[in-house]
């Protein structure tokens, strides 16, 4: 689905990395498992991570779940994350919107906060 150098992994024109940005290429569902992100964040003294992206039920939830035992407070940007319809082995389809809501509910119920981007931008900077 996300093959290196494929069409699905290119940056959107309005979201191209700037020279000062760090781009990490992960090989696992969670960004923490296959990169040095934890070391980088700890070096910077980061205590809270805001997670957004694709797919809510997989990569977003995986990163959030892995961040908590590493000592981070997790906030999910609900309107900056999304997922896709999935078809189970028995042929039953799970709608993307229902899956997105369920993933956010699980995160909020167990290990993180879920907020809109508007609410996140109003958080105090530390």
Give residue ranges: language-model regions.
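Active-site-adjacent betaalpha module
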Residues: 1-126
């Amino acid at each position: 689905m996300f093959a290196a150098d494929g069409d699905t992994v290119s940056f959107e024109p309005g979201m191209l990395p700037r020279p000062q940005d760090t781009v990490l290429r992960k090989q696992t569902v969670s960004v923490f498992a296959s990169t040095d992100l934890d070391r980088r964040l700890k070096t910077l003294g980061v205590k809270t991570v805001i997670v957004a992206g694709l797919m809510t039920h997989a990569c977003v939830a995986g990163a959030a779940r892995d961040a908590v035992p590493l000592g981070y407070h997790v906030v999910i940007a609900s309107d900056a994350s999304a997922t896709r319809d999935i078809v189970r082995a028995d042929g039953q389809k799970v709608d993307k919107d229902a899956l997105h809501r369920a993933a956010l509910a699980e995160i909020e119920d167990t290990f993180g906060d879920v907020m809109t981007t508007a609410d996140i931008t109003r958080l105090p900077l530390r």
